[in-house]
Amino acid sequence: MDAALERNKQFVAEFYDLIINQKDFERAKKYMGPRYKQHNPLVKDRPEGLREFIEFLKTNAPEAHSEIIRSFAEGDYVILHVHSLRQPGTRGRAIIEIFRLDENGLVDEHWDVIQEIPETSANPNGMF
């Protein structure tokens, strides 16, 4: 794979870990462009919106942890397939996270699609 795409995947994985697992906005903001645009309807735009989201996690889901199962990169986009747990011992959620990097290689835009992991499934394939 192209070295630039691998760098993009690593960069976004580090950013994601700082947000969700470490809940460290001060370090995460260095990965963000100033125009950071959020498409999750529950989170505000700009770096300040992400800071508020991290504070929400610290207060309401301090044990939240996510594992990146796989990642993909194409051009300025990085996609993560994630197993997210708000609390230990739960089934959690399957999440697709999409990030777009700006001309300086910083995270500039974010989308996500979130699906609860059900207790039972119509097939044996699992979500990951």
Predicted regions and their residues:
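C-terminal and inter-domain tail/linker signature
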Residues: 1-128
